[in-house]
Amino acid sequence: MATTPYEHAINSTRAVLTGIGPDQLDAATPCASWKVSDLVNHVVGGQYMFHSALQDQPPSAAAPDFAAGDFVASFDEGAAQAVAAFQAEGVMDRIVRLPFGELPGSQLLYLAATDTFVHGWDLAKATGQPTDLAPELAAQLLDGARKAIHDSMRGPDGAAPFGPEQKAPEGAGNADQLAAFLGRTV
């Protein structure tokens, strides 16, 4: 199974992670309940969680503080493990158990790409990096999000997977439009 959108999301977010300095780890992010270090931990830990779920293994009981170490190297390792797990025979058709429910591997692949990419956008915004990330991938993920995300999945930060849709500014790039659709103020 091709994991190309997910791998593009990994590459885009990795570029953002390399631009984060230690002095930025306490900065606020578009995810109001998280600072940069929290979001780094989520993005890096998410890669390991995708891998564990695809291997039918429970997630780690105690999440490491990736932001306190070489989080780019940890991201690379977790992403490589997740990509390999997504490429296993039959995984796209298998039901995968996650901490928040069950879904087919093919849907988890889309979720992994979107989560990884959008949180890369969040980190770019929080650390003053450009947010017009991977325009073609962002357009593809936005199209999928418009089909998959419904109002019942939206609510206040921390209470629902996505915030209320925001209006993107006139002429906003695809990544900014995706972020706004998923509830970020652009």
Regions found by a protein language model. Give the residues of each.
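Structured surface interface patches that mediate subunit assembly and partner/cofactor docking
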Residues: 1-15, 19-32, 49-186
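Extended, alpha-helix-rich binding/interface surfaces that flank or overlap catalytic cores
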Residues: 39
